[in-house]
Amino acid sequence: MENDKASHASPSIGVNEFVVQGEISIDDSERSVKSVSVSISDDEDSKTDVQDNMATPSTRSKFQTDLAIDNRLLEKDPKYKKLFTEKRRRRRPESCINLMTKGKGTGQKDNINDQIFSLRILPGSDLNSLKDSLWIIKISTQPDVEKTIARAFSDFYWLYHQLQNNHWGKTIPPPTRSNILVEKDEFAINHLFMIRNNEKYDPIFNFKPEYIISLQLMAMIKHIFNDKVLRLDSNFIDFISWDDDLPESLQIVVDDSTFTGDKILMTSSQFRELKEFHKQSKKVESITNSHASLIPVTELTEIYISPTKLFSRKDYQRLFQPQSTDNTFNNNDPLIQEWIPKSKTLFTSLSFGSSAPTYQEASTEIQACHDWVSISKEQWKQLLYHVLQYIVDEAVKVNSVINEFTECLKQISLDEVIRANSELFLKFSKLNESFLKKFKGASRQDILKLIILFDENVRFCESFESILNQRLKLGKILSIIEVDLDKKKNFLDKLSPGNNNSNNEDLKIRTAEDEYRIVLKRYNRVKQSWEKIMEDILNERKEFEKREAAEVNSCLKSIRDLNMDEKKHYLQLWQDFVPDEHISQ
Amino acid sequence: MSDLNDVQENAKLNSETRNTGKAEPPHGTTEYVAEAEISKNGVGSPKKSPKKGKVGKGDNNKVETELVHTALLEKDNPFMEEGPTGFTKSALLEIPGMRSHNLKNPNEDYEDDSEGLLPLNQESNAETCRTSLSGSINSMNGETSASEEPSVSNRKKSARIHILEAKRVSEGQGRAYIAYVIQFENSTVQRRYSDFESLRSILIRLFPMTLIPPIPEKQSIKNYGKSITGSSSKYLLPSEGSGSVDLSLSVIHASVNNSDEKLIRHRIRMLTEFLNKLLTNEEITKTSIITDFLDPNNHNWHEFVNSSSTFSSLPKSILQCNPLDPTNTTRIHAMLPIPGSSSQLLLNKESNDKKMDKERSKSFTNIEQDYKQYENLLDNGIYKYNRRTTKTYHDLKSDYNEIGEVFAQFAHEQAQVGELAEQLSYLSNAFSGSSISLEKLVGRLYYNINEPLNESVHMATSARELIKYRKLKYLQNEMIKKSLNSKRAQLEKLEAQNNEYKDVDKIIDNEMSKSHTINLERPNNNTGSGGKSYGGKLFNGFNKLASMVKDSVKYQETDPHTASINLKKEIEQLSESLEVTENDLEVISKVIKNDQLPKFSKEREVDLSEILKHYSRYMRNYARQNLEIWKEVKRHQDFA
């Protein structure tokens, strides 16, 4: 029967397959070269995409090759043609703006070596619904150049998911804690919102949740700016609407010194800009197939992985969407028919059933990271809760009791019943008054910064969890590829024993070997990126620990100094009280 | 027989006062000077040595109790021990107490032999007793505060009562009570709560014009019986520092819950303070009631009280007592009326009529309002806010502790970064140290600030009781006045009636004489038969009327006389009662207004100033400890 099948095959089909093989090999060689390169080259590609005229000589060849690929895609599918042409049309006026600002930029660069950007985020609407709230981002440089951007709160989440999806192994803190949004954590919500609603508390301590959230958003943007890889991402540049070149030695300073609590109304132009950004973000999602807007906000630890990031479209269709092969491949080909597995559940989706391949963590370091992040998250939460409760008890309750006690002592000193001790009570009330004045708002701001630091660390741990979960999913995908490789190898083993019909069998063997080699190369590339992700994760943890140590250390030092000064003043108060008592006696 | 008993009691009191008067002058001054020298030399040494002496004397006391079997041995033991104790510890104040205690026994024997004394001697003894009591009151009024305070402080230093143990004792039939082991000088005795209650009620009747310190409220025995059960175990109560009741020697000898432990501790504290304040009251210490209460020979206090004729003869109500000498209650005092709650309305009506009484009641009303306001200020002001402050500090202590634990755990987990772990551990130590110092502060505030303030509130309540006593006496006086006036009005009415009756008799006699003249005129007109019959009828009517009037006059003459005699007797009695009550009221008002209340106000001012002094001291120590803690943290930081 095999001989009959071989006799039916026509030479023209063989020639076509050979041509297809050539195309695949060309694409594979280019991408294999990319996989060898570091992540900076990927950023360079995105950089060239953003700025066409700024291509350097070293990247010209890549640029040309990219254009060639794009041309081929445009020829095949009219959808892509429309998208790319619109993109180019949109960039033309930006190039004009670039020409205008280039002169200014060069002038500024001559004067200042390191540029310092101050970042400030203010609420642009009421905080009735946090998801629908609007925020105004102000970025200003020292030569009084300020840029104002309006963004919705959901846009921050969009940016978070885009960056997380594009840069595996990088931690981006979420915009704010998920507990506040879904109201799971009653303790935090009660303390945060109770403080605002309770009128008894003094205005210094009566900070608003808008202030906390603005600090968290500023911390997120600051983190992205400080990372040399993340800040060059096209999604981030679109989010910020930045047209100039970002200097490499850029430093971001968060302006959280004063906060009046007044909301800033959005102008009509900002609102229009916001709508345009929404449209643009939808297009970007459709291009990159990331589906960032579809991911629910509450699931911060679940990052969507797009298989198209790992595989070419053909391989993706062949592996995960067998039904769609009708368009590109001939079903009558006996080789392809034999290759398609009988049970389709294995490849139809990423959700695995009972037959899903099991994946176990081999690296002890990554397992340690899993343990570390869960413990650290819990510890930071505990610190946050206890410090909050400590503030409420010491700064609020004690002061309120002493305040009422002071009024009572004044009343007693004025009363005629206790005349001999009236002076003593009056001095005692004065002591309490001086206590309230001195210790009312002294260490409050400092403790508040500590709370925000703890909260930021909690959010970092959540982001780190998402990275680890991302890597787990990638491990599962590698298992799928391994299964595919095993099947291909078995197919080759079946074909190799037959040596009778040399021409037909050689042709089959070569096609099978080519396919096996292609899949094996992709597997190696993916596995290499998997190893790279592991290294990124470990580096990220080390960097976090260093940064955390520095920040906590500085914060604790300031707390220590303030506490010492506070105790000195406290002791001085009571020491001053005693001689007066002797004089009165 | 009752008169003889009163005379004997007066003789006893007189002898006791004489003995105490004799005992004090030759030794008191020298001993005070000696004690002052001891205190100047060293602060700690005088405190330690009396305790050791007490322990030794306790052993001697046990030996005495074991050896005592008959009265003869009881007589012989003091004579045998008097010599060596006198030689070894002549400088201590305890010896005059011992001597006075020993001297009482032969005097009692002497009083038993005095039953055969002559009546004249009895009367003279009674008079001397009265004069001596009044003299003592005058001397108390004359004393200055400067001389009073050192003596009080000296006594406080020399002899203080401690309640060593609180244990459960069963009295059969499934009932149980808490027994408090009291130590005073060299003797220990067990007393239950009802014994303290009985002592206080006796003192209120014996010294109605004196401010008796309060005792804690009564708790149900059933609750105690349920809560205090099981095997016995000792809970050593912690000491709360200086300037307060020292409970470091006290032990709760029972397995109790935390709340019950606090309750018993509170009771021990209040009862200890009660007894110590009684010791500082000179008027009370002149009598032997305190020493009798603390005498281990009197095992059962209730039996002692019932067997004692002095206590059993006291009237039940303090309003029927003689304020100067309650043991010498006269017949007049016994017959005084006791005002009820409705009599306050009468007081309001009476006060509107009389200006002098109105002024008096106004001044005392102002005083009462002042003390009520004072109590309110203490209770709702200082005490309330101190309690709230203590609670807030307690919560803060918990927060410090939790932060310390969290930082310590975090430092342990973050061992990779050595520098950060080290600093976190130092910071956790700082928070833990702050928690410990705050715990000490909370304990001190609770035991040495809040509870003394609570005692001050109760003392103010006792002061109001004194004012109420005076008020009831005033009501009593008003009742007597009212009844006296009503009796006098009745007497006047009777006299007026007598006068009216005499006038009527005169009129009747005149009319009778007139009728006689008419009778003479009738024979002149007897010419006709009609005139004769009409004149006869009229004469008969007059005769009948005259006879009726005469009979009525004879009947009324005897009754008014008897009534007037009775009324005069009652008026005389009421006049005597009025005189007595007015004198008593004057004395009571004078003593309360000029002696007791100023004394109390000085004491309360001293107490409040001491409380605030301790408060500032505790706060200062707390601040200093906190500063040292954070300085140490900074030192470690600089060293790292």
Swiss-Prot record, chain A:
Gene Ontology BP terms: protein retention in Golgi apparatus; regulation of TORC1 signaling; retrograde transport, endosome to Golgi
SUPFAM superfamilies hit by this protein: PX domain
GO cellular component, one term: cytosol
Domain of life: Eukaryota
GO molecular function, one term: phosphatidylserine binding
Disordered: region residues: 27-59
Note: Present with 1270 molecules/cell in log phase SD medium.
Protein name in UniProt: Uncharacterized protein YKR078W
Swiss-Prot record, chain B:
UniProt keyword annotation of tRNA-binding present: no
Modified residues (Phosphoserine): S361, S363
Any Gene Ontology biological process: early endosome to Golgi transport
Impact noted for substituting Y193A: Abolishes the intracellular punctate localization and decreases the cytoplasm to vacuole transport
Bias type Polar residues, positions: 1-18, 126-153
Membrane-topology annotation of the record: Peripheral membrane protein
Database matches in Pfam families: PX
Binding site residues for a 1,2-diacyl-sn-glycero-3-phospho-(1D-myo-inositol-3-phosphate): R192, S194, K218, R267
Molecular functions per Gene Ontology: phosphatidylinositol-3-phosphate binding
Compartments, record wording: Endosome membrane; Preautophagosomal structure membrane
GO cellular component: cytoplasmic side of endosome membrane; cytosol; endosome; phagophore assembly site; phagophore assembly site membrane
Residue segments, region Disordered: 1-63, 126-156
Domain PX: 140-301
Residue ranges of coiled coil: 475-512, 562-593
Residues with PTM N-acetylserine: S2
Gene3D superfamilies: Arfaptin homology (AH) domain/BAR domain, Phox-like domain
Top-level division of the source organism's lineage: Eukaryota
Keywords assigned: Acetylation, Autophagy, Coiled coil, Endosome, Lipid-binding, Membrane, Phosphoprotein, Protein transport, Transport
Record text about domains: The PX domain binds phosphatidylinositol 3-phosphate which is necessary for peripheral membrane localization of ATG20 to the perivacuolar punctate structures.
Entry function: Required for cytoplasm to vacuole transport (Cvt), pexophagy and mitophagy. Also involved in endoplasmic reticulum-specific autophagic process and is essential for the survival of cells subjected to severe ER stress. Functions in protein retrieval from the endocytic pathway. Required for proper sorting of the v-SNARE protein SNC1.
Family of the protein in this entry: Belongs to the sorting nexin family.
Self-association state and partner proteins as the record states: Forms a complex with SNX4 and ATG17.
Note: Present with 358 molecules/cell in log phase SD medium.
Protein name as annotated: Autophagy-related protein 20
Organism: Saccharomyces cerevisiae (strain ATCC 204508 / S288c)
